[in-house]
């Protein structure tokens, strides 16, 4: 199965018409993964026996015409729990964790009759921007195996970009869907906070985390979002907002005509690579040619986003990860003398360096005497950043800009420099702080590596982002470019 030459709708039509069976498609998917993943290293766990049984059952029942995802394989980031299928969060702490329940999104995909083929690699507990922080392996960029795939959803991004699957789920706390999507030349959406249930997502930063789809095209992404979105009684932060058929509206390649688009001057400031700037300016020209107005706007407090995020996110992480103590959950150390020994040794052995760094930062920020100076101040900065977005989006349909300051960097180049790594998320983090939807899509190339564009919208207005993304896609060909797997540029 050549996933580079099809899309979800075409594949579903072939399944309904019995040009291919769900079992044949699933088997071909596993064959392809086994051929390519020795180089890409996108997957941590495969679900072959259960997936083939599910595919056979779908074939026996007949692929439903009103289920646009029925019979189609999907990959899940390995911090989304799957009943009976190992879920590790790429951490030694959870190396042998077999969940006894499904995440809500896992259930929703099963109800849509998608077939989960496996779990993808990530930075440990989703903390990182390169997937190098995984305890188990380093995933490669599909376009160049010497480059990182981004993170923390690098495994899902690489799986889609390398043609192993047509669709995958990731999670985004500070850019972890959008940045790897940009680095791999695919489409990734961080939905509005609350659009998708977090029940069954192994928590990092509970006020920031969102699960979202990663696909090869905007329309496929929209189809996936409709399947996983909606209120969930298990997640009280999930919204009761109605979930439209996002893909149904994607028919007009000129749908941005008359729209006002904001392009923040801060998004093209020093530190953003020239090729990235040129790609975004060219995209702005494309929108102008389609009848939109593109205005220079300002998000003056954007520069404080990274600092605020690493205080808030790390504080929430230090609280969420308390449960992994060697007694209730997670790895338990051997040769311990007392209760304190259990805690110290289990956590020291189970967590990697980046997770430890963030736990310590978060614990410090929440400690007596420092709470007001750090956490409370970061929360106030968050409000200011939200107000900046609100002011711009009051007069503009959406905001556009780059996803990351540079294309994918080399494996090993930044892993020993946490501050440099953190600054790669300077353009995505503010969107999480504000709880807004952000769509990443291919917008160009720099020395053979993909450059991503980010569209940022009003709360629960993913529809406008999809329309704008679709219009751009239909008037360019960046999303049609595919990697010569691992070819160095």
Curated annotation (Swiss-Prot):
GO BP terms: translation
Keywords noted in UniProt: ATP-binding, Ligase, Nucleotide-binding, Protein biosynthesis
Cellular component GO terms, alphabetical: glutamyl-tRNA(Gln) amidotransferase complex
The EC number(s) this enzyme carries: 6.3.5.7
Domain of life: Bacteria
GO molecular function: ATP binding; glutaminyl-tRNA synthase (glutamine-hydrolyzing) activity
One Pfam match: Amidase
Active-site residues, Swiss-Prot/TrEMBL: 77, 152, 176
Catalytic function, reaction form: L-glutamyl-tRNA(Gln) + L-glutamine + ATP + H2O = L-glutaminyl-tRNA(Gln) + L-glutamate + ADP + phosphate + H(+)
Matches recorded under NCBIfam families: gatA
Protein function: Allows the formation of correctly charged Gln-tRNA(Gln) through the transamidation of misacylated Glu-tRNA(Gln) in organisms which lack glutaminyl-tRNA synthetase. The reaction takes place in the presence of glutamine and ATP through an activated gamma-phospho-Glu-tRNA(Gln).
HAMAP family with a match to the protein in the record: GatA
Family named by the database record: Belongs to the amidase family. GatA subfamily.
Subunit architecture: Heterotrimer of A, B and C subunits.
Protein name, per record: Glutamyl-tRNA(Gln) amidotransferase subunit A
Annotated source species: Levilactobacillus brevis (strain ATCC 367 / BCRC 12310 / CIP 105137 / JCM 1170 / LMG 11437 / NCIMB 947 / NCTC 947) (Lactobacillus brevis)
Taxonomic lineage from the root: Bacteria, Bacillati, Bacillota, Bacilli, Lactobacillales
Primary gene name: gatA
């Amino acid at each position: 199965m050549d996933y580079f030459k099809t899309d979800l709708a075409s594949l579903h039509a072939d399944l309904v018409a019995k040009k291919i069976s769900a079992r044949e498609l699933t088997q071909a998917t596993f064959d392809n993964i086994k051929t390519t993943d020795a180089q890409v290293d996108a997957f941590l766990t495969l679900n072959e026996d259960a997936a083939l049984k599910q595919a056979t059952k779908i074939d026996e029942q007949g692929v439903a015409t009103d289920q646009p995802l029925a019979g189609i394989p999907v990959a899940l980031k390995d911090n989304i729990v799957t009943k009976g299928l190992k879920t590790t969060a790429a951490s030694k702490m959870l190396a042998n964790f077999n969940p006894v329940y499904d995440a809500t999104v896992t259930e929703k995909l099963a109800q849509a009759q998608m077939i989960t083929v496996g779990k993808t690699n990530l930075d440990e507990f989703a903390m990182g921007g390169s997937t190098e922080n995984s305890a188990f392996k380093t995933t490669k960029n599909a376009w160049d195996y010497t480059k990182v795939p981004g993170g923390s959803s690098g495994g899902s991004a690489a799986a889609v970009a390398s043609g192993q699957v047509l669709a995958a789920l990731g999670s985004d706390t500070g850019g972890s869907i959008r940045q790897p999507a940009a680095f791999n030349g695919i489409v990734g959406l961080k939905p509005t906070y609350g659009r998708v249930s977090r029940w069954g997502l192994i928590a990092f930063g509970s006020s920031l985390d969102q699960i979202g789809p990663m696909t090869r095209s905007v329309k496929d992404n929209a189809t996936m979002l409709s399947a996983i979105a909606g209120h969930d009684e298990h997640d009280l932060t999930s919204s009761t907002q109605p979930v439209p058929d996002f893909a149904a509206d994607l028919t007009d390649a000129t749908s941005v005509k008359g729209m006002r688009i904001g392009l923040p001057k801060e998004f093209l400031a020093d530190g953003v690579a020239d090729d990235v700037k040129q790609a975004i300016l060219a995209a702005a020209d494309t929108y102008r040619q389609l009848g939109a107005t593109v205005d220079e706007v300002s998000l003056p407090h954007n520069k404080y986003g990274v600092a605020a995020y690493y205080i808030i996110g790390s504080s929430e992480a230090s609280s969420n990860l308390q449960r992994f103590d060697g007694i209730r959950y997670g790895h338990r150390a051997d040769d311990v003398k007392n209760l304190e020994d259990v805690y110290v040794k289990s956590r020291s052995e189970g967590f990697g360096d980046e997770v430890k760094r963030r736990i310590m930062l978060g614990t410090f920020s929440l400690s007596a005497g420092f709470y007001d100076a750090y956490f409370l101040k970061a929360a106030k900065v968050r409000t200011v950043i939200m107000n900046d977005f609100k002011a711009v989006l009051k007069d503009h349909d959406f905001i556009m800009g780059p996803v990351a300051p540079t294309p994918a960097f080399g494996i090993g180049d930044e892993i020993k420099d946490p501050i440099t790594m953190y600054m790669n998320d300077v353009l995505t983090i503010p969107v999480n702080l504000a709880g807004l939807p952000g769509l990443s899509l291919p917008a160009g190339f720099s020395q053979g590596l993909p450059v991503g564009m980010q569209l940022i919208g009003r709360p629960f207005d993913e529809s406008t982002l999809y329309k704008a993304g679709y219009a751009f896609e239909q008037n360019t060909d960046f999303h049609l470019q595919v990697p010569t797997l691992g070819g160095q540029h």
